[in-house]
């Protein structure tokens, strides 16, 4: 472990590759089995069984679905912009995965004398000789949140279909409306932690001092606005089947369609991980489980809540969606910032 490459110890590169592989496999498996879990959970909530045929209680259903989509015919509409049509699913999928780069999923561990944070993104401090957390984690996530929608808009435009275009335009309008409220909702967290570092925000929530208790309104607003940003029910207007056939992905098939599907669920996992980090104490929990296990448990609980919401609430009408974002959520976030600022000023 004493070898160096480009002035950095080999342990830095080894740990980086290991963390990338672990996180990628975790997100991929979670996405695959979230589709299965959603069908089973909604099925039981509606007094049905859900998938039962493929494997024991349908446990192999995600594999069967993946194989089916992989071997289906790739169809590109004759009037479509082929290059944009093919690249749109990639633009939608990649930001959903790389958002995990800055999320800390456990406590710092020590290997061969080096302290390694359980977080992919970081830089090697040559003075201390340790991997240090970047102080821009939240800004990185907010920036990525607005990139995925470009893939959806591009898919709608390049398909040369009115239904796809309407779905893409709805997605962009929805993202603008709710990203503003979501960003303002977490300003109160910055005011309490006095940092943009996710490591620092998690550290401030130790011993049960979770920000969801100190900032319940911000927690609820951020979670709901995030669901609207990623087009989850009841905010799935961009792909409303009763109005737009299948919205922005109407003309897609095979693995291109699967990539949009994966992007939706990967975004859901990322939103739940960010919410866990900002409001639910991150990896903090009772000592009988390691920190990373608590982090995963909280993320899976929020994923279950997302599925519960889908099974419970009907889809909003488009004008109701816009009114809720601009006339209800945005003023509430501003009021919450003002009240938090007053409280912080009085305490200091």
From Swiss-Prot:
Enzyme kind, highest EC tier: translocase
Q: What is the lineage of its organism?
A: Bacteria, Pseudomonadati, Thermodesulfobacteriota, Desulfuromonadia, Geobacterales
Reactions this protein catalyses: a quinone + NADH + 5 H(+)(in) = a quinol + NAD(+) + 4 H(+)(out)
Cellular localisation: Cell inner membrane
Q: Which residues cross the membrane?
A: 11-31, 83-103, 136-156, 172-192, 208-228, 268-288, 289-309, 324-344
Q: Which GO terms describe its biological process?
A: aerobic respiration
PANTHER family xref list: NADH DEHYDROGENASE SUBUNIT 1, NADH-UBIQUINONE OXIDOREDUCTASE CHAIN 1
Q: Which cysteines are joined by disulfide bonds?
A: none
Q: Which InterPro entries match?
A: NADH_UbQ_OxRdtase_su1/FPO, NADH_UbQ_OxRdtase_su1_CS
What does UniProt give as GO cellular component? Answer: plasma membrane; respiratory chain complex I
Q: Which family does it belong to?
A: Belongs to the complex I subunit 1 family.
Recorded hits in HAMAP family, A to Z, give:
NDH1_NuoH (MF_01350)
Pfam short name (any one) = NADHdh
GO molecular function list: oxidoreductase activity, acting on NAD(P)H, quinone or similar compound as acceptor; quinone binding
Share what the entry says about its subunit structure, partners included.
Answer: NDH-1 is composed of 14 different subunits. Subunits NuoA, H, J, K, L, M, N constitute the membrane sector of the complex.
**Protein name as catalogued:** NADH-quinone oxidoreductase subunit H 1
Function per UniProt: NDH-1 shuttles electrons from NADH, via FMN and iron-sulfur (Fe-S) centers, to quinones in the respiratory chain. The immediate electron acceptor for the enzyme in this species is believed to be ubiquinone. Couples the redox reaction to proton translocation (for every two electrons transferred, four hydrogen ions are translocated across the cytoplasmic membrane), and thus conserves the redox energy in a proton gradient. This subunit may bind ubiquinone.
What gene name does this entry carry? nuoH1
- Enzyme Commission number(s) of this protein: 7.1.1.-
Its record classes its membrane topology as: Multi-pass membrane protein
Assigned keywords, A-Z: Cell inner membrane, Cell membrane, Membrane, NAD, Quinone, Translocase, Transmembrane, Transmembrane helix, Ubiquinone
């Amino acid at each position: 472990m004493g070898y160096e490459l480009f002035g950095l110890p080999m342990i830095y590169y080894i740990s980086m590759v290991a963390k990338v592989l672990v996180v990628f496999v975790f997100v991929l498996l979670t996405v695959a089995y979230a589709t299965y879990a959603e069908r089973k959970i909604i099925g039981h909530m509606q007094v049905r069984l859900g998938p039962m045929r493929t494997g024991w209680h349908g446990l192999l259903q995600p594999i069967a679905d993946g194989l089916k989509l992989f071997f289906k015919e790739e169809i590109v509409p004759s009037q479509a912009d082929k290059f944009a049509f093919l690249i749109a699913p990639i633009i939608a999928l990649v930001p959903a995965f790389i958002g995990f780069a800055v999320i800390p999923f456990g406590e710092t561990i020590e290997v061969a004398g080096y302290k390694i944070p359980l977080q992919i993104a970081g830089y090697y401090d040559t003075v201390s000789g340790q991997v240090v957390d970047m102080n821009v984690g939240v800004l990185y996530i907010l920036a990525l949140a607005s990139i995925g929608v470009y893939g959806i808009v591009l898919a709608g435009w390049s398909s040369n279909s009115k239904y796809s275009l309407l779905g893409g335009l709805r997605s962009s309008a929805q993202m603008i409306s709710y990203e503003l409220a979501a960003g303002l909702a977490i300003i109160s967290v910055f005011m309490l932690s006095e940092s943009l570092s996710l490591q620092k925000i998690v550290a401030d929530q130790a011993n049960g001092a979770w920000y969801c208790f100190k900032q319940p309104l911000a927690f609820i607003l951020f979670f709901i606005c995030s669901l609207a940003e990623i087009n989850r029910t009841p905010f799935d207007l961009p792909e409303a089947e009763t109005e737009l056939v299948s919205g922005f992905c109407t003309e897609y098939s095979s693995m291109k369609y699967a990539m949009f599907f994966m992007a939706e669920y990967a975004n859901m996992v990322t939103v739940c991980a960010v919410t866990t980090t900002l409001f639910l104490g991150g990896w903090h929990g009772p000592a009988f489980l390691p920190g990373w296990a608590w982090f995963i448990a909280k993320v899976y609980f929020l994923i279950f809540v997302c599925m519960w919401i889908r099974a419970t609430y009907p889809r909003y009408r488009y004008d109701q969606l816009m009114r809720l974002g601009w006339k209800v959520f945005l003023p509430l976030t501003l009021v919450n910032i003002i009240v938090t600022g007053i409280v912080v000023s009085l305490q200091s």
